[in-house]
């Protein structure tokens, strides 16, 4: 299973993985994602840590609480999903080459 793996390089590989993880965290945290619902009546901005940064609500929705709630939930969930999907994509691209275990 590990016939071609050089265990003497394990510390070096771990150090490289930690460095890449720190770079990944900084890069993803700086990204922003915008999701809209209700044809753009609600806009939600999230960062790469899935934290909501901004919410914009069109004044026409202020009289319709039920619609506002539904559209707001939808936009927030979409913004978080965009952030999570990007984290998965970026992690796969960044850490995909760390295999090296010969398995």
From Swiss-Prot:
GO terms for molecular function: DNA binding. Its main location: cytoplasm. It comes from the Bacteria. Keywords: Cytoplasm, DNA-binding. SUPFAM superfamilies: YbaB-like (SSF82607). One of its GO terms (cellular component) is bacterial nucleoid. Pfam families: YbaB_DNA_bd. It is found in: Cytoplasm, Nucleoid. Belongs to the YbaB/EbfC family. PANTHER family: NUCLEOID-ASSOCIATED PROTEIN YBAB. Binds to DNA and alters its conformation. May be involved in regulation of gene expression, nucleoid organization and DNA protection. Homodimer. This is Nucleoid-associated protein CFF8240_0066.
């Amino acid at each position: 299973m590990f016939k071609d793996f050089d265990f003497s390089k394990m510390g070096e590989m771990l150090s490289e993985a930690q460095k890449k993880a720190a770079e990944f965290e900084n890069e993803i945290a700086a990204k922003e994602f915008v999701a809209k619902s209700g044809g753009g009546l609600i806009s939600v901005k999230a960062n790469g840590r899935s934290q909501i940064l901004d919410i914009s609500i069109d004044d026409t929705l202020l009289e319709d609480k039920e619609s506002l709630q539904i559209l707001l939930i939808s936009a927030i969930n979409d913004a978080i999903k965009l952030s999570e999907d990007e984290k998965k994509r970026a992690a796969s691209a960044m850490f995909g080459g760390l295999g090296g275990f010969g398995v």
